[in-house]
Structures are given as C-alpha cells and as structure tokens.
Amino acid sequence: EIASCLVGSEMCIRDRCFGGINLEDIASPDCFEIEERLDQMLDIPVFHDDQHGTAVVVLAALYNALRVTKKDIKDITVVLNGPGAAGTAIIKMMHTAGVGKIVAVDEFGILYKDRQEGLIPHKRALCDITNPDNMQGTLADALKGADVFVGVSKPNLVTDEMVHSMNNNPIIFAMANPEPEITYQKAKACLLYTSDAA
C-alpha cells in the first residue's frame, strides 16, 4: 500500500499533474508514514480526510459547544479515547487551538511518557503534547473532572457513572462507528452530546 501510493506520487512530481493529494481510507499507522513521505516528496498539500477532515469537524463542534456552555478553551480538559489516525489529528489540532489539557487513552490506558506497553511511535510523540501531569490509569480515571470526551474508538466503553464523574456541563463527542462509546440515553446527564450518526 505504501509503495503503490509513493509510486503514483513520483509520477505526479514528474508530470506536475495535481494541485493537492487527498488520502482516503488508509489505516493507522501506515497513514502517518505515507503522509510524512508524501509531504517530503511533494510541494503540494497532502490531506488525509480520515485524519484532518475529522479533526476539523470535531474542532468546529468543540468551538460551538464551548460557546453554549460558556467554557474557555484554555481552561478545559479534553479526554480522547482512540489515538489512531483520526484521534491523533484531533489531538494535534486541539493542541494547536489552545486546549488547556489533553489526555489520550488507548486500549492499554492513559498515554504517559514512561509507559512501555503499546507506545508505538505516533503515540510516543503524542506524549509530548498530552498528559502534562503524567497521569496513569484507565479511561474512567482520565474522565474524572474532565470537561470533554472525544471518542474515536469502540462501542460502549463509557458508562453513565463515568459521565457523572466529569466536570459540570460535560461535552460528549462519542463517534465510534457504527455504535458510539456511549448512547444518548446513557449520557442524558450531559448538556451536549453528539455521535457519528448525528
């Protein structure tokens, strides 16, 4: 997959045939390598909609939710579950936008600097911009006192008890596809909720 993508790109360099490249449906972690290598090879924009398209929409939704809840982006804590292709881009975009604190969680728990298990290169890099307190634990631990949950992971991982442990007026973006991390019915204690189906 990586080789065929790069061969096609080399032809574009030679023929100067495109003004930009949109990558589609390339799984993590291959998508990171492909995007990085294309960025190095080409002098045109490279956009992976699974990463960047999702991140743009989530950030726009966050801005709106913060306006409704009257919270300041620099004062919030965001917990993101599922730092794959979309999750990584969401974290980077939220960091650039000035989110106060971001905590990333994967199937092994909270990402932190000294963790050994499952810390592949793109997740290790995320440790530089997330979890400034070097917190350890589970998704439930991460959600205590958090303002925002962003899920791009698996269905039914978030319980109503976890939502109740969050800060006042929590914002939930449960986007696992086809079923969200928590349903609206279970998260009805939340002020704002969205799912991939919305």
List each language-model region with its residue ranges.
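Glycine-rich phosphate/diphosphate-binding loop of Rossmann-like nucleotide-binding domains
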Residues: 60-143
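Phosphate/diphosphate ligand-binding glycine-rich loop within oxidoreductases
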Residues: 15-53
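A glycine-rich, Thr/Ser-enriched phosphate-binding loop motif common to dinucleotide/cofactor-binding enzymes
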Residues: 48-64
